[in-house]
């Protein structure tokens, strides 16, 4: 049984509030429609319910891609991970739980957001719960919320000390996604090539704040490196 997760979290206020409000309103409307369809039909497999669920999943995909574009363009908000000391501290906190809370497969620390892929080292019962849960509900699973709270809470405190500031460091919400069967390689490449995509480096191996698990490096090595 495998429940490898692709998680993206970002700095507070790094997406325009108008964009966030629009997404929240549309998402809430679709969720309400889903509840109504389930209540009316008493069947979560009805054609109407299935159609609405597909629309919700499509909305979430579109929102992820839009956020990724806004983050790469650094449209608004802070870019604290441009400071090497801050980026190092974030990377250090991702490594800290490797082998204890999860098996860390990859990450990329960008100027205002982080992509990471890991497999939680949890009970088979919790793994089953993760696999059953819709992506948007993953953050509410106690075992996962504890992991993310540990990563984000400690790194926020340490980074704020470096920056001599107080206040929110990370946005509360994150993008959480269970990697589907056969999509693992694609997800790893997506994460590692984030800095390549926006022209920071030519090969992912050259980016200081990229990480790939040792056993996977040869599999994903850049052709030109």
Q: What is each model feature region?
A:
Residues 1-225:
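Short catalytic/metal-binding and nucleic-acid-binding patches
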């Amino acid at each position: 049984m495998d429940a490898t997760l692709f998680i993206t979290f970002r700095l507070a206020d790094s997406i325009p509030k108008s964009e966030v409000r629009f997404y929240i309103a549309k998402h809430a409307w679709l969720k309400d429609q889903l509840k109504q369809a389930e209540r009316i039909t008493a069947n979560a497999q009805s054609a109407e319910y299935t159609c609405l669920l597909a629309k919700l999943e499509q909305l979430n995909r579109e929102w992820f891609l839009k956020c990724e574009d806004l983050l790469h363009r650094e449209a608004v908000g802070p870019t604290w991970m441009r400071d090497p000391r801050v980026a190092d501290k974030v990377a250090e906190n991702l490594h800290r739980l490797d082998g204890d809370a999860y098996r860390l497969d990859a990450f990329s620390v960008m100027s205002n957001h982080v992509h990471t892929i890991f497999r939680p080292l949890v009970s088979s019962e919790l793994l089953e719960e993760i696999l059953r849960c819709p992506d948007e509900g993953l953050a509410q699973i106690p075992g996962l919320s504890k992991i993310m709270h540990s990563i984000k809470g400690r790194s926020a405190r340490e980074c704020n000390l470096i920056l001599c500031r107080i206040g929110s460091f990370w946005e509360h919400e994150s993008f959480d996604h269970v990697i589907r069967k056969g999509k693992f390689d694609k997800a790893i490449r997506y994460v590692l090539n984030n800095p390549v995509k926006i022209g920071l480096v030519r090969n992912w191996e050259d980016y200081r704040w990229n990480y790939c698990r040792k056993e996977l490096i040869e599999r994903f090595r850049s052709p030109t490196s």
